[in-house]
């Protein structure tokens, strides 16, 4: 989509478009960009949503990504946007603080695309893909422990818990056992090594996902603290949005969608009253649901962009009520792995 607002259909690196933003039409319909508006794209990636927002209205976008390579790749789009786009290398959990630091408040909209980008999957050296051999890294930024560090240091019980709670993998225990056995023989430092270990435990049936999908998902979420980041980002958006501002979130698996659904349901719920307490108590709704339930991609998009297959979109509009206390949502996160003492196994 190209309009008189001045950015074309190339990707964020300036070359031919290759990263297809998932559910772009639905995102723009629910975000409803307007002229002179301020919008945050909390997950810039290849810039698909940012470009769509800039094309939809004569507005400004503050785009955030914790991956410095994504920020570097977006330099051409910044130039093309002629002062309407600011890129920031940071975590989207800090979107309210980042907006204030750049004199970009209050916000008229926030969009979040939760999950690994196709750019990261395409780069074997980033260690996200079980289909391309590379170092077992999976870090979206350039700091903190890698997936190889977790595989090397967690014991069998902790590994099984991580793979089950963050990957929803029902074979988590035998997978963890196989990982521990394999690392006793030699360090597991490559994505192909780990994928092969898991593939010996989980058989792939025709038409089903790769056996290592859920294990890799669990490690990626743990390495990048993705669920905690998501909860904090939702709370940050609640604080930063102006009345009437829109929050649009696209998720790709049930753990993320459950958090977003629970958050929006909680924030859109009116205070309850009873015959014992006829005066309703509790905070006023901070959001009004724009999408009644979940929005999913159409069959044409799924056929043309397999990444869209599991996508789910939820959207809400900020009311003029004060933001709710942020600390009431940490119970949405899976329980941490048990602490073990003694010899690692």
From Swiss-Prot:
Give the residues annotated as coiled coil. Answer: none
The answer on whether this UniProt entry bears the keyword S-adenosyl-L-methionine reads: yes
GO terms (molecular function) for this protein are: rRNA (cytosine-N4-)-methyltransferase activity
Q: What is its main location?
A: cytoplasm
Where does it reside?
Cytoplasm
Q: Which InterPro entries match?
A: RsmH, SAM-dep_MeTrfase_MraW_recog, SAM-dependent_MTases_sf
Q: What are the alphabetically sorted keywords of the record?
A: Cytoplasm, Methyltransferase, rRNA processing, S-adenosyl-L-methionine, Transferase
Q: Source organism's superkingdom?
A: Bacteria
GO terms classed as biological process? rRNA base methylation
Reactions it catalyzes = cytidine(1402) in 16S rRNA + S-adenosyl-L-methionine = N(4)-methylcytidine(1402) in 16S rRNA + S-adenosyl-L-homocysteine + H(+)
Enzyme Commission no:
2.1.1.199
UniProt GO cellular component terms: cytoplasm
Q: Which residues bind S-adenosyl-L-methionine?
A: 47-49, 65, 92, 113, 120
Q: Where is this region: Disordered?
A: 296-345
* Membership in a protein family: Belongs to the methyltransferase superfamily. RsmH family.
Q: Describe the function of this protein.
A: Specifically methylates the N4 position of cytidine in position 1402 (C1402) of 16S rRNA.
Q: Which NCBIfam families match?
A: 16S rRNA (cytosine(1402)-N(4))-methyltransferase RsmH
Name of this protein: Ribosomal RNA small subunit methyltransferase H
Source organism (scientific name) = Xanthobacter autotrophicus (strain ATCC BAA-1158 / Py2)
């Amino acid at each position: 989509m190209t309009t008189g607002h001045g950015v074309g259909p190339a990707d964020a690196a300036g070359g031919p478009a290759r990263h297809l933003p998932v559910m772009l039409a639905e995102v723009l319909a629910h975000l409803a960009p307007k002229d002179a508006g301020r919008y945050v794209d909390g997950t810039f990636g290849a810039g698909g949503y940012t470009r769509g927002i800039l094309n939809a209205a004569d507005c400004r976008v503050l785009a955030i990504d914790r991956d410095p390579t994504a920020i570097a790749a977006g330099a051409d789009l910044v130039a093309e946007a002629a002062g309407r786009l600011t890129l920031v290398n940071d975590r989207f959990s800090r979107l309210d603080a980042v907006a204030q630091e750049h004199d970009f408040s209050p916000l008229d909209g926030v969009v979040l695309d939760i999950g690994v980008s196709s750019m990261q999957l395409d780069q074997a050296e980033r260690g996200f893909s079980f289909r391309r051999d590379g170092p077992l890294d999976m870090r979206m930024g350039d700091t903190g422990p890698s997936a190889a560090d977790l595989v090397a240091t967690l014991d069998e019980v902790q590994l099984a818990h991580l793979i089950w709670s963050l990957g929803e993998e029902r074979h988590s225990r035998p997978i963890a056992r196989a990982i521990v056995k394999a690392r006793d023989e030699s360090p597991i430092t490559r994505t192909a090594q780990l994928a092969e270990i898991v593939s010996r435990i989980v058989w792939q049936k025709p038409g089903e996902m790769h056996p290592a999908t859920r294990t890799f998902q669990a490690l990626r979420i743990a390495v990048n603290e993705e669920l905690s980041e998501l909860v904090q980002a939702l709370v940050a958006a609640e604080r930063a949005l102006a009345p009437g501002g829109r929050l649009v979130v696209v998720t790709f698996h049930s753990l993320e969608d459950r958090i977003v659904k629970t958050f929006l349901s909680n924030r859109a719920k009116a205070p309850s009253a009873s015959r014992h307490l006829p005066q309703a108590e509790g905070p006023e709704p901070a959001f009004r649901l724009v999408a009644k339930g979940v929005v999913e991609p159409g069959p044409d998009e799924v056929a043309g962009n397999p990444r869209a297959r599991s996508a789910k979109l939820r959207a809400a509009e900020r009311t003029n009520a004060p933001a709710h206390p942020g600390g009431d949502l940490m119970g949405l996160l899976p329980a941490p792995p048990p602490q073990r003492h003694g010899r690692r196994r």
